[in-house]
């Protein structure tokens, strides 16, 4: 089945919308749409994760270091390291959680 990835989830005012595309023993693939001003506060995860920005611009903080990502950019979130996500403007991202 062919599809346009960024069309799989829509923005909602003052919300973060997510849709799980795959959820397997080896990992998961989730698409997110962050409305402007939304954020995920600092947290950790037990697995490595790969983020790709598929629309807009995002601010990802890993262990206190801020990274500004544009559409098409990717970043790896190491397991057990504190990270946060901030939407100064609307953006969409793919999150690949890689379980070991």
Regions found by a protein language model. Give the residues of each.
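A short, N-terminal "cap"/entry segment at the start of jelly-roll beta-barrel domains
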Residues: 1-26, 61
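Glycine- and acidic-residue-biased ligand/ion/polar-headgroup-sensing regions
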Residues: 47-59
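A cytosolic small-molecule/anion-sensing beta-strand core signal
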Residues: 54-55, 70, 89
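Short acidic-glycine-tyrosine-enriched beta hairpin
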Residues: 64-79
């Amino acid at each position: 089945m062919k599809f346009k990835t960024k069309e799989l989830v829509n923005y909602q005012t003052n919300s973060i919308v997510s849709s799980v595309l795959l959820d397997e023993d080896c990992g998961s693939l989730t698409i997110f749409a962050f409305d402007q001003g939304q954020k995920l506060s600092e947290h950790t995860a037990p697995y490595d994760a790969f983020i790709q920005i598929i629309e807009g611009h995002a601010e990802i903080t890993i262990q206190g270091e801020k990274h500004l990502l544009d559409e098409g950019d990717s970043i790896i979130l190491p397991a057990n390291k504190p990270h946060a996500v901030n939407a100064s403007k609307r953006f969409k991202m793919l999150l690949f959680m890689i379980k070991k």
